[in-house]
Amino acid sequence: MNYDPVFDKWHEECGVFGVYDRTVDVARYVYWGLFALQHRGQESAGIAVTDGHDVELKKGMGLLTEAIKELPSLPSHMGTGHVRYSTTGSNNPRNIQPLVIHYQGGQIAVAHNGNLTNALAIRKRLEADGSIFQTTMDSEVIVNLIARSKAETQEERIADAARQIEGAFSLVITTNDSLVGVRDPQGFRPLCLGKTANGYVLSSESCAFDAIKAEFIRYIDPGEMVIIDDSGVRSVIYAKPEKIDKKLCVFEYIYFARGDSHIDGQSVYQSRLNMGRELYNETKYDADIVMSIPGSGTTAALGYARASGIPFAEGLVKNRYSGRTFIKPNQEERELAVRMKLNALPHIVGGKRIVLIDDSIVRGTTSGIIVKMLKEAGAKEVYMCVSSPTIEYSCHYGIDTSVRKELIAATHTVDEIKDYIHADKLHYLSREGLCCAVSDIAPNDLCFACFNGDYSVEVPAEQEEGVKYVLE
């Protein structure tokens, strides 16, 4: 997941999608599946299709429509696709997925969502043993382990590799004769199974099934591998029982996943409505209107408005054509960029006490600009409510987060942050309130590492200050 320096947000990490169907245009199905997952990655995209003998790969930089100008034309019954934000490895054409390799056991195409915590150690061992790496992605470690495995079948080779890697990984892989889905023993990143009329699909999120009219079947369990071929779907629990410890990323519900998805049985949209309700229960602010930062906290703001009876209003308008900014701006440029993307409506906010909902505050650089804009437009008071607890620790499970010292809540109290962003009041949703919001998931099954530093998979010392370029 990437950090947006203008809007002070962590962004989605990657999206993976796969199809096994002998009766459809597989490349087109993968394309539309990736289109539905575009929110999970906007740096690059790739599609690989196969007939079991040959593989055709199309890939490129940018959004899906920019990256894939022409679909693969190889008649095929299997395909996998990937949209990417760089987590480990720089934003470089050689790091575009899926990764396709031909080796003595056949050919495979691998799409990976997540981040491996032991990639550096494995890569050093493999290089010492003669392996050559072409990219700076941790995902390339996976294909090397598969290729070097002594197991007899491709599926067994994949399981063998999966048992050696640690951290976050949801994989969609095509082999010579099957489509394979693999989820790590903690289930950090989502992966689900769907059914087409005559085949099956795998996806990071259930929302992508709707795009191709596929039927949702179930979620892939932590530590599980599914193998799809002409005989149907087989399931293997590849991980050792003592390794399986469900820890679903709670930020999928707060911000990452699309609102119309269900992640492991929990509606993302309902979760966000509930977060707004819980924010009201914890604050009971007396205000005139409830607002959100467009595209960030809107559903939670609706939940707050419903619970409180305070009217919801759109007091900020977003310029949908402003695009993303990948430069690291100085404060003046950041303020200009925010003002280019957002504009306050004086006739809506003038003289009002505003409850402003956001889903998170990472560095605090943008919140103050928005509060300033609202007050310049005549707002009487601004009460900032955040639908997540304070982010005090970096994530090492598929998110390119800031180093800890750059996280404002790691070095400042809530009162200090309130003063820094010039809000009249500031409240973060408690962990207890968050658990109430994500009510269909047991609290012990959620990962809160970015809030409390409780890492369920050990993080090597060399990665404690960030993992993005650790393999370069």
Positions of PLM-derived features:
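A conserved beta-strand->alpha-helix junction
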Residues: T135, E140-V143, F312-G323, Y420-V438
